[in-house]
């Protein structure tokens, strides 16, 4: 039990936020119950009133950075439809606050909520660079592109403080090992010195997420992310430095950004992207509840229509977990999205080719000795 102040009246088992007002600067507007936890929790109004009277700060919107110490850092990706074989996540949870993020559910495995906890409690893996180096020195490891990150953005705000992603990139460069990056943060340009060296040997590919050309849409979907203008500038800077960029127009959400596919494709192509990918939004696990709560607070006039159109893409449900279908959807609306994406590729990417990364430069000696390059 946690004792609040000196008054046993305020003893509570645990605390979780249950907001009534709109929380600016956050995607999720509440914490959902953790499906793995035995008890559900609630932050009571009387506790908040107690904090006000006593002059104590409840820190309801403060981000916490919590160190964790995993034994391994390179993860084998078993899903056959996500376009990567291995991932590395320097952080768990993400302060960007993207309301649709599929990684929210993973926070429940750590005992937290997929809602506000996902954005406020960031788990930091400070040992990631050392664990990565140990993996690359392993006798059994065979070169295959490792993606930063398969789950949460490796250039989220925490990276500016901890620098774990940069340290990992230094390891990849040292071992001449191919690496991919997925981000929507302009902080990636901080590491241009390392990225250009990797690019010279065809060891790097950067995926930049661009979900809308509307700042209004961006602000409500992804409240703590870089502006669209800055993301397009990021694509341009990377491309000008001969770093191959794939744009992620994901997720496509019917009724919110589905009408922007052609304009988005043109914008990222003009900025220098060599290709683009897309997914149709699916709201698996706790994300369905979080998204519905969010859309009824932010876009109440469109909420029912958007939710219905998402369901139309997934057989009447907000989620479809079938491999090969879950990220593209089915039905009339999903087909329209696919057709628009196909047209965009033909119109803006027809003569562009995305390079295959080089796995031949990486060769480790047994016993952890590295062949000199």
PLM features: what roles do these ranges have?
Residues 186-189, 253-262:
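Active-site glycine- and acidic-residue-rich loops that bind
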């Amino acid at each position: 039990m946690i004792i609040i102040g000196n008054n046993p009246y305020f003893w509570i088992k645990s605390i979780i936020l249950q907001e009534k007002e709109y929380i600016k600067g956050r995607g999720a507007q509440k914490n959902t119950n953790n499906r793995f936890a035995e008890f559900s929790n609630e932050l009571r109004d009387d506790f908040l009133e107690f904090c006000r009277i006593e002059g104590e700060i409840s820190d309801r919107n403060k981000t916490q950075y919590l160190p964790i110490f995993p034994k391994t850092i390179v993860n084998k990706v078993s899903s056959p439809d996500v376009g990567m074989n291995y991932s590395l996540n320097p952080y768990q949870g993400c302060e960007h606050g993207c309301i649709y993020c599929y990684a929210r559910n993973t926070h429940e495995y750590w005992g937290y909520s997929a809602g506000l906890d996902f954005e406020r409690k960031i788990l930091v893996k400070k040992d990631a660079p050392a664990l990565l180096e140990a993996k690359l020195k392993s006798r059994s490891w065979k070169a295959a592109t490792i993606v930063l990150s398969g789950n949460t953005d490796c250039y989220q705000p925490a990276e500016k403080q901890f620098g774990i992603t940069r340290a990992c990139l230094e390891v990849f460069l040292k071992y001449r090992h191919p690496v991919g990056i997925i981000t929507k943060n302009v902080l990636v340009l901080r590491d241009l010195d390392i990225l250009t060296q990797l690019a010279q040997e065809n060891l790097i590919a950067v995926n930049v997420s661009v979900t809308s050309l509307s700042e209004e849409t961006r602000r409500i979907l992804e409240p703590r992310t870089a502006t669209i203008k800055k993301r397009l500038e990021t694509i341009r800077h990377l491309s000008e430095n001969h770093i191959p960029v794939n744009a992620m127009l994901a997720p496509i959400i019917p009724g919110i950004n589905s009408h922007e596919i052609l304009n988005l494709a043109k914008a990222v192509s003009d900025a220098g992207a060599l290709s683009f990918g897309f997914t149709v939004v699916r709201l698996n696990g706790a994300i369905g509840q979080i998204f519905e709560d969010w859309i009824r607070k932010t876009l109440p006039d469109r909420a029912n229509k958007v939710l219905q159109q998402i369901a139309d893409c997934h057989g009447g449900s907000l989620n479809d977990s079938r491999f090969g279908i879950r990220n593209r959807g089915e039905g009339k609306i999903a087909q329209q999205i696919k057709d628009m994406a196909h047209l965009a590729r033909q119109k803006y990417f027809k003569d562009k080719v995305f390079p295959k990364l080089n796995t031949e430069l990486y060769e480790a000696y047994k016993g952890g000795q590295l062949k000199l390059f």
